Amino acid sequence: MPSRKTGEIWLAQLDPTVGSEIQKTRPCVVVSPDDMNAHLRTVIVAPMTAGSRPARFRIPLTFQGKQGLILLDQIRTLDGVRLVKRLGALRGPTLAATLQTLQAMFAP
């Protein structure tokens, strides 16, 4: 299984889903810590989308020439087999905003 690092963007198979969970195979940002990723077969990801409304817990970004959002309200744990391929990684301010928003969500 390939290693995954915090901030990497992977194409992930999210189906099957239920109710309001975001679905399909789509880019997702790895948000679990590197030490956790190194020891577990699971990974925590935040899906990305180009078709959603902005909110304080949704981080805007441009990836592969497309405007989109990182949906921190839709984070989930996936088995590593759901990760299809590595597409890239977040950098600088976008990665910092993502991690800061997660911290604010869980440790207000």
Regions found by a protein language model. Give the residues of each.
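Conserved functional hotspots at enzyme active or ligand-binding sites that engage polyanionic ligands
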Residues: M1-P108
